[in-house]
């Protein structure tokens, strides 16, 4: 129980103001309890006296007019009043008020009937004990002055002879009926008071709330409902304004704004690929998009070393500085000397270059084949990459798909013509029937991308007309190992093209479209390559 000076419990918000005031005022609650208990006592007395009067007489008039039904209604009303004191609910209070009003009318009728019967019994003074078939009955009637007998024309009253004196029974019945009349009158008064009190309490609170201003009560802060809660808010859906959505949890990854693209690397989230497992390279790394080393050639896999090899055709373009996360490096690829094809160099946008199978990146080989006269160097002379002339046409192994990517930092203009010159040189040197490039290698070199640009330029020509390809050899991987590396490299190129949303020049867009077409055409011949490689391995 809280102390006298402590804060009181807050009023239930769901109850009306009248009910809350009833709980706050202990005097009114005690009055309701007293009225309910009085009604219960009066009801019990009315019922008991009425049944006692019924037991003394067998007359139909008295029995039919005995108000025991008024006693039951008052008893029920008093019970509801006690419940309303214990639980001051709106429904219980209203029901108590209505039932008290009904009891007022019933008690008025009962009091009138009981008083009339009492006067009747009082007027029948002459009582005689009469036996009917061994049954004794007291018959009371009006006394005639001329005779001592009862008149058949007047009213008669039959009483049960509980004792020898019939006059004593009549007097007892008269007293009981007068008692019932008095109890009904008292019950009428109590029920009227209960009805008036409940009605005044409910109506006065509504009238005061309607006409009088709201008074400020210096209530305890703990008892006051804080403003802004659901109890003080009325939701108006017409004026409801939805709250602002929260900011995105992750910034956009593939925006190609020139100011921001040069400051950060290209972060691509690739799905787990067997290519990374095969060559121990984390494909999902934000700084390393693909391995810095191409798959080994078929001759090295089967144990047939070529006569001479060409190594390190692309050297490291620029060393990574402390503040620049992107660097450019070249691939080091062994190339057989007896091949008859164009040698293509490419760059990669990885944080570094892995050493080649024959030596470190950038170290020239003892003997490097020379390019034909008139061939343009695929790399800018200022970038530090050179290609030395060699005998005839040389080519990579057919299992090595050539990839050509862009550097994500630095001057984009120095890299754009590089792949274009390389592609033009390859097309001019390739002749029908030679194994200069596979379709995927040629298309990959066409896909050299610019690191910055407007994304709308990329969307201008989504389906360019592919340029005619020179007739190339349709050699396929001749082993399951080469087939696996070939398929993984092709998937990696396709994913890189799929995530490239930066702007490209017009000629580069045509190259990318041709590369997409070449990658699509290679899918049909994959099953044939696997089957042929399996046959060669069995032989």
Swiss-Prot record:
Predominant location of this chain?
membrane
What is the membrane topology here? Multi-pass membrane protein
Family membership, please give it.
Belongs to the ENTREP family.
Q: Which of UniProt's keywords are assigned here?
A: Membrane, Transmembrane, Transmembrane helix
Return the Low complexity bias intervals: 347-365
Q: Which domain of life is it from?
A: Eukaryota
**Membrane: is it a keyword of this entry?**
yes
Q: Does the keyword RNA-binding apply?
A: no
Where it sits in the cell: the answer is:
Membrane
Q: Quick one: where's region Disordered? A: 301-481
Q: Which InterPro entries match?
A: CD20-like, ENTREP1-3
Any idea what this protein is called? Answer: Protein ENTREP2
Compositional bias (Polar residues): 306-331, 395-408
Under the cellular component aspect of Gene Ontology, which terms does the record hold? membrane
A Pfam family found in this protein is CD20
Give the transmembrane ranges.
31-51, 65-85, 89-109, 176-196
């Amino acid at each position: 129980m809280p102390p006298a000076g402590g804060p009181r419990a807050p009023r239930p918000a769901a109850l009306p103001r009248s009910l809350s005031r009833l709980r706050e005022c202990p005097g009114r609650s005690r009055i309701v309890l007293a009225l309910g208990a009085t009604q219960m006592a009066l009801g019990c007395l009315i019922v008991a006296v009425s049944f006692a009067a019924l037991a003394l007489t067998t007359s139909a008039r008295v029995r039919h007019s005995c108000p025991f039904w008024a006693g039951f209604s008052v008893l029920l009303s008093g019970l509801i009043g006690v419940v309303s004191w214990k639980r001051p609910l709106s429904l219980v209070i209203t029901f108590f008020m209505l039932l008290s009003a009904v009891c007022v009318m019933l008690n008025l009728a009962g009091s009138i009937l009981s008083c009339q019967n009492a006067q009747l019994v009082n007027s029948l003074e002459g009582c005689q004990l009469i036996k009917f078939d061994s049954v004794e009955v007291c018959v009371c009637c009006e006394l005639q002055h001329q005779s001592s007998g009862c008149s058949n024309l007047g009213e008669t009253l039959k009483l049960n002879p509980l004792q020898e004196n019939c006059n004593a029974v009549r007097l007892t019945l008269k007293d009981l009926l007068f008692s019932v009349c008095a109890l009904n009158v008292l019950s009428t008064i109590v029920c009227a008071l209960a009805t008036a009190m409940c009605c005044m309490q409910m109506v006065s609170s509504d009238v005061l709330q309607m006409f009088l201003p709201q008074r400020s009560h210096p209530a305890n802060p703990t008892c006051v409902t804080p403003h802004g809660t659901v109890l003080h808010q009325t939701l108006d859906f017409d004026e409801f304004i939805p709250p602002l959505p929260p900011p995105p949890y992750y910034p956009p990854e593939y925006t190609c704004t020139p100011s921001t693209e040069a400051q950060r690397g290209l972060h691509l989230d690739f799905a787990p690929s067997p290519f990374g497992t095969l060559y121990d390279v984390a494909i999902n790394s934000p700084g390393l998009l693909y391995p810095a080393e191409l798959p080994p050639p078929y001759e090295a896999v089967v144990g047939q070393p070529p006569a001479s090899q060409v190594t390190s055709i692309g050297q490291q373009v620029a060393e990574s500085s402390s503040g620049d996360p992107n660097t450019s490096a070249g691939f080091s690829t062994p190339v057989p000397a007896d091949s008859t094809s164009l040698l293509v160099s490419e760059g990669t946008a990885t944080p570094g270059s892995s050493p080649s199978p024959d030596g470190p990146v950038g170290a020239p080989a003892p003997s490097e084949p020379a390019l034909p006269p008139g061939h343009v160097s695929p790399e800018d002379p200022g970038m530090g990459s050179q290609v030395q002339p060699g005998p005839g046409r040389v080519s990579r192994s057919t299992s090595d798909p050539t990839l050509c990517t862009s550097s994500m930092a630095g001057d984009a203009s120095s890299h754009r013509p590089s792949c274009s010159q390389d592609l033009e040189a390859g097309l001019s040197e390739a002749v029908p029937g030679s194994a200069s490039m596979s379709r995927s290698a040629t298309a990959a070199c066409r896909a050299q991308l610019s690191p910055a640009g407007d994304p709308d330029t990329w969307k201008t020509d989504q389906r360019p007309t592919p340029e005619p390809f020179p007739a190339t050899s349709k050699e396929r991987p001749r082993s399951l190992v080469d087939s696996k590396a070939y398929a993984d490299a092709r998937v990696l190129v396709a994913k890189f093209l799929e995530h490239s949303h930066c702007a490209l020049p017009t000629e580069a867009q045509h190259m990318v479209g041709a590369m997409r077409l070449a990658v699509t055409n290679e899918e049909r011949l994959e099953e044939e390559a696997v089957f042929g490689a399996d046959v060669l391995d069995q032989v």
